[in-house]
From Swiss-Prot:
Homodimer. Activated by cadmium, cobalt, copper, and manganese ions, but not zinc ions. This is Ferric uptake regulation protein. The keyword Mitochondrion does not apply. Keywords: Cytoplasm, DNA-binding, Iron, Metal-binding, Nucleotide-binding, Phosphoprotein, Repressor, Transcription, Transcription regulation, Zinc. Gene3D superfamilies: 3.30.1490.190, Winged helix-like DNA-binding domain superfamily/Winged helix DNA-binding domain. GO terms for molecular function: DNA-binding transcription activator activity; DNA-binding transcription factor activity; DNA-binding transcription repressor activity; sequence-specific DNA binding; transcription cis-regulatory region binding; zinc ion binding. The gene is fur. It comes from Escherichia coli (strain K12). Acts as a global negative controlling element, employing Fe(2+) as a cofactor to bind the operator of the repressed genes. Regulates the expression of several outer-membrane proteins including the iron transport operon. It is found in: Cytoplasm. NCBIfam families: PRK09462.1 (NF006999). InterPro entries: FUR, Fur_C, WH-like_DNA-bd_sf, WH_DNA-bd_sf. Residues 2-84 are annotated as: DNA-binding.
């Protein structure tokens, strides 16, 4: 918990119980790409009395402070993940919503080449690749929203 206290203070945020609990849930392996609603449900399951409006407010504060990264994958629902030191891209299944993170040096190099060719110096980018799971009908997969 001390590390979370330090992280909040370093981000310029006051240490509060809702912020600590939300940060704790975001650090769980099963909550790598989580919506505000799913995070709220997890807090309820933990016996925490933190309202949905508070969850949204804290996630927006975390996004502004750089603690989380907001993604707007296909379907319009925002999902959040803890901001990571290493850059990665995402593969998203349009059927089940599964999100797979990947890194590929050749893709990164090609993006820099294209930007340079057009006179742009990249400072940031996001790559989302959408498709369908090769395993067939994955819509019933109960683990569909786990980040891998």
């Amino acid at each position: 918990m001390t590390d979370n206290n330090t992280a909040l203070k370093k981000a310029g945020l006051k240490v509060t119980l809702p912020r600590l609990k939300i940060l704790e849930v975001l650090q769980e392996p099963d909550n790598h790409h989580v919506s505000a609603e799913d995070l709220y449900k997890r807090l309820i399951d933990m016996g925490e009395e933190i309202g949905l409006a508070t969850v949204y407010r804290v996630l927006n504060q975390f996004d502004d402070a750089g603690i989380v990264t907001r993604h707007n994958f296909e379907g319009g629902k925002s999902v959040f993940e803890l901001t990571q030191q290493h850059h990665h891209d995402h593969l998203i299944c349009l059927d089940c919503g599964k999100v797979i993170e990947f890194s590929d040096d050749s893709i990164e190099a090609r993006q820099r080449e294209i930007a340079a060719k057009h006179g742009i110096r990249l400072t940031n980018h996001s790559l989302y690749l959408y498709g369908h799971c090769a395993e067939g009908d994955c819509r019933e997969d109960e683990h569909a929203h786990e980040g891998k």
